[in-house]
Swiss-Prot record:
A GO CC term assigned to this protein in UniProt: cytosol
Gene: nusB
Name listed for the protein in its UniProt record: Transcription antitermination protein NusB
Family affiliation: Belongs to the NusB family.
GO molecular function terms attached to this record: RNA binding
Source taxon at top rank: Bacteria
InterPro entries named among the record's database cross-references: NusB-like_sf, NusB_fam, NusB_RsmB_TIM44
Keyword match RNA-binding: yes
UniProt keyword terms in alphabetical order: RNA-binding, Transcription, Transcription antitermination, Transcription regulation
Membrane-spanning intervals of the chain: none
One Pfam family cited in the UniProt record for this chain: NusB
Length: 138
């Protein structure tokens, strides 16, 4: 697994934990709950993702709500919210990864943590956000 993939996986887990139990962000970002060996750069990238999502969460959630047609935001699973938030942050606020790669990675993470059906749901929302809210860069 690539370092970036590991970082995204850690970030999804951290965002999940924040949503589920609401511990202080500082505590979550210590990653004491993550039991796999990671490199400092993997943790640093995960921290930057989580901090970016938390900083921009209101705008991110507004877009997720806008494009999750026929789904009340409260019905979206916590895991799917975490993946969507991470991915919308990457699409709108990060230029490190091509946008199509961001969506592909989100779909794979969703398949890993949730299901094929959830992956289609996440893909649909992210694709709509990509088409309507971002400048295209592939």
């Amino acid at each position: 697994m690539s370092a970036r993939r590991t970082s995204r996986e850690i970030a999804v887990m951290a965002l999940y934990q924040l949503e589920l139990t609401g511990p202080p962000l500082k505590e979550v970002l210590k990653f004491k709950w993550y039991d796999k060996k990671t490199e400092p750069e993997e943790r640093d990238f995960a921290v930057s993702i989580v901090n970016g999502v938390v900083k921009n969460q209101e705008q991110i959630d507004t877009l997720i709500k806008k494009y999750s047609k026929n789904w009340d935001f409260s019905r979206i699973s916590i895991v799917n919210k975490a993946i969507l938030r991470l991915s919308v942050f990457a699409l709108l606020y990060s230029w490190e990864v091509p946008k199509n790669v961001t969506i592909d990675e989100a779909v794979e993470l969703t398949k890993e943590f949730e299901s094929e059906e959830s992956a289609r749901f996440v893909n649909g929302i992210l694709d709509a956000i990509l088409k309507n809210e971002t400048k295209s860069d592939g």
